[in-house]
A protein has these predicted regions:
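Conserved small-residue-rich beta-alpha loop and adjacent elements
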Residues: 1-28, 74, 96
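Short alpha-helical
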Residues: 12-15, 40-42, 61-62, 72
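Structural detector of well-ordered beta-strand residues that form the stable sheet scaffold
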Residues: 6, 34, 76-78
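Short beta->alpha connector loops at strand-helix junctions that form conserved
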Residues: 3, 8-10, 37, 57-58, ...
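A structured beta-alpha segment of the ubiquitous adenosine-cofactor-binding alpha/beta core
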Residues: 34-52
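ALDH superfamily catalytic-core signature
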Residues: 28, 53, 61-170
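CheY-like receiver
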Residues: 18, 45-46, 101
């Protein structure tokens, strides 16, 4: 009776995956929860196994692959493939609170979470005030030189860094 699960953290964050494995092993028996660390080949091998359910969070291309492999065993799947997460701010909002929450959500893990705000839809009458409050909140969190603050997140790998550079300054 009961459920057990296998967790396969991202290979892009090996230190976090190692810590997760350590913490889980300290509080739960391995027959209940196992953490499997490894690269893409590890993920592919796991998908050859017959699970009762698969929950995947990541990008759409890998999501298609997960769905295809799960279908071979008729395994139900939940795919959390991200998307665009808008923030809507109207004049009735507490702008300071909105700014604080937007900055937290966007700057947590350098915005590299599937629920990070991607864009803001703001009522024109409060746009300027919101922008000023966002700048204040960023400075509160990271100081006047955010890039030299150790709490300011880093991009997970060179490929993502280069993609962002191309978005900012296309060739």
């Amino acid at each position: 009776a009961g459920n057990c699960c296998t967790l396969k953290p991202s290979e892009l964050a090996p230190a976090t995956a190692t810590l997760l494995a350590q913490l889980v092993s300290e509080v739960l028996p391995p027959e209940l929860v196992s953490v499997v660390n490894g690269d893409v080949t590890t993920s592919q091998a796991l998908l050859e196994e017959e699970f009762d359910y698969i929950f995947y969070t990541g990008n759409g291309n890998v999501g298609k692959y997960v769905m295809e492999k799960a279908a071979q065993h008729l395994t139900p799947v939940t795919l959390e493939l991200g998307g665009k997460s808008p923030v809507i701010v109207t004049r009735s909002a507490s702008l300071r609170l909105a700014a604080r929450r937007i900055v937290f959500g966007k700057f947590l893990n350098c915005g590299q979470t599937c629920i990070a705000p991607d864009y803001i839809l703001v009522e024109n009458s409060v746009k300027e005030e919101l922008v000023n409050l966002l700048q204040e909140e960023i400075e509160k969190m990271y100081g006047k030189a955010p890039l030299s603050n150790p709490d300011y997140g880093k991009i997970v790998n060179r490929r993502h860094f280069e993609r962002i550079c191309r978005l900012i300054a296309p060739e």
